[in-house]
Design a protein with these regions (language model features):
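Flexible, solvent-exposed loop/hinge segments and secondary-structure transition points
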Residues: 1-164
Length: 165
């Protein structure tokens, strides 16, 4: 009996390792395309390759990936990738800023937030929606939720997710 269980376990591990190896490259390519599409969406109009020019910036002990966007050699903005823990787990967001530091747009790259609650963050803060943060400059005024005295409308029952923005 023990030999059978050991054999089944060994075969299962080998199959999982094989499938992992088969899917590693397609997953990496899909993630790269998602990032490329998101950078194009949050900082439109550049003619360089922001992903190839990626820089890492540390602020208050936190590392951020910065993708500078230029047009004809002139800096027009940047996409900043940030990762934080939401209520349900890791939340990865890409925020586009113009040259003056105002938010152009954002893209929620990945999350494991509660469907119907925290997952609304993918659109909640977009232009024209209730929690619209476009045009705001976090360098001039903190992006805090209205219940804490800020100007950002939080998603009902998802304040933790909103605080991450």
């Amino acid at each position: 009996m023990l030999l059978v269980l050991t054999g089944v376990t060994a075969i299962s591990v080998a199959l999982l390792a094989y499938v992992n190896e088969l899917t590693k490259e397609p997953i990496a390519q899909a993630n790269a395309k998602t990032l490329s599409d998101a950078v194009s969406a949050v900082v439109p109009g550049f003619d360089n390759d922001p992903i190839a020019e990626k820089k890492t910036q540390e602020v208050n002990g936190v590392q951020y990936a910065v993708y500078p966007a230029t047009k004809e050699g002139k800096f027009i903005g940047a996409a900043v990738e940030a990762t934080s823990m939401g209520f349900g787990g890791e939340l990865k967001v890409l925020v586009g800023f113009d040259a003056e530091g105002k938010i152009i747009d954002y893209s929620l790259l990945s999350h494991v937030e509660t469907p119907g609650l925290g997952s609304k963050a993918a659109d909640w803060f977009k232009k024209g929606n209730k929690g619209d943060i476009t045009g705001m400059n976090p360098g001039e005024a903190s992006l805090t939720v209205s219940k804490d005295g800020g100007k950002v409308d939080a998603i009902t029952a998802s304040t933790i997710t909103c605080l991450l923005y």
